[in-house]
Structures are given as C-alpha cells and as structure tokens.
Design a protein with these regions (language model features):
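Aromatic-rich carbohydrate-recognition surfaces in CAZymes
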Residues: 1-53, 74-82
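Active-site core of glycosidic bond-cleaving carbohydrate-active enzymes
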Residues: 9, 30-41, 68, 72-103, ...
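Short hydrophobic/aromatic-rich motifs at helix boundaries and adjacent loops
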Residues: 13, 60-62, 84
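Short, flexible helix/strand-to-coil boundary loops that buttress conserved ligand/catalytic motifs
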Residues: 47, 58, 132
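Short clusters of hydrophobic/aromatic residues that line enzyme substrate/ligand-binding pockets
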Residues: 53-54, 128
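Residue-level signal for pocket-adjacent positions within structured domains
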Residues: 49, 60, 123
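Acidic/His metal-coordination segments adjacent to aromatic residues that form catalytic metal sites
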Residues: 1-2, 56-74
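Short amphipathic coiled-coil heptad-repeat segments
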Residues: 115-120
C-alpha cells in the first residue's frame, strides 16, 4: 500500500491496463480488480480537494524518506496517481464493473492533470518543479528525476512543446543534471 513505496498503490492499475492493451488479456483485469479498487479508494482518502492532488510526501525516485521541500505533493507521485485514476476508469469500462464510479475517477484524473500543469510549471525558472506553487522546491526551481522525465514524455500530456523545450534547455544548462542513467 502507501507504506511500501509511495507509488505502490498506483502501480497495479497502470500495470494491469498496460498489460491489457498490449496483450488483450482481459482475465488479468478481473483478477486484479478487487486490489485495484481497494488502492483507488485508499488514494481517494488521501485526496486533497483544495489542491486537487494526492497527499504524497515522498517522490518516486527516492521513497525512503519524506521530502519537505515539495510541500507534501511530489510531482512524479502526483503524475502516477493521475494515471492510476485514468486507468482505473478504463479498467472499469472494459470489465463492466463499478460503472457508477467511472465518471468520478475520470474526473479525478482530469482534475489532477490540470492541477499538475498549473501548479508545477515555474515560468521564471523554466522548469517543472518537484513541488507545487508555495513549496520550497517551486521557489528555488528544483526538480526530481522521475517527475522531470514524466513531464517531458509526450505520452503523459503534461508539458506543452514550449515547456518541454524550455525545460530541456534548463536541464542542459546544469551540467550535473544528466548522468548515464538519466536526468
């Protein structure tokens, strides 16, 4: 759950949906559905209506300790939970289960993606920061590996082309930002 890596609750839905769209194996969706719903409901309990984000104090790249500079909402973790909600809704549609919750989870995913785009892009620093507006990370223009990589990939639909280009230039201007392992 939330105590075994901050993204643990989000990953089953994402993995199950990726498996389904790759293989067409719907049986796995039915087998995993009870756990997927349990984790979605746990995430619902941690959802901050005002921020439109999941309270997540640890980032995906390092979930052994809390990162207070992110203000309680780490970017990569937020993206992962938004994807989880999106995929939970898709799984429910395909399986015909929990039909009454589909719109709720679709809306939650959309709210989170909108909030991420609005709260994490720092125009002055030309980057997506690891924490939202008001956090130390936002004020100082700090980013974290996983969140940075996720916003840059067009697959996730976070950064606009302009933001992507600016952020890549910002990363390139920091010689210590790149390693042989990634950002």
């Amino acid at each position: 759950g939330f105590n075994n890596g901050v993204d643990c609750a989000a990953m089953p839905a994402i993995a199950a949906w990726d498996h389904y769209i790759t293989t067409g194996d719907i049986q796995l969706l039915y087998e995993m559905l009870p756990g997927i719903i349990k984790y979605a409901e746990e995430a619902d309990a941690r959802y901050d209506e005002e921020m439109q984000l999941i309270h997540a104090t640890m980032c995906l790249a390092q979930d052994a300790f809390e990162e207070p500079e992110n203000g309680g909402y780490c970017l990569g973790t937020e993206i992962t939970f938004a994807l989880m909600y999106q995929d939970v809704a898709k799984i429910c549609k395909v399986t015909g289960c929990y039909l009454e919750r589909i719109k709720f989870w679709e809306n939650r995913a959309e709210e989170m993606f909108t909030s991420i785009k609005e709260k994490y892009w720092n125009e002055e620093k030309e980057c997506f920061t690891s924490g939202p507006i008001g956090s130390e990370a936002y004020e100082k223009g700090w980013w974290e590996t996983t969140g940075a990589e996720m916003v840059l990939w067009p697959r996730f639909g976070i950064a606009t082309e302009r933001q992507r280009n600016l952020f890549l230039k910002t990363i390139e201007s920091n010689p210590e930002a790149f390693s042989e392992f990634g950002i």
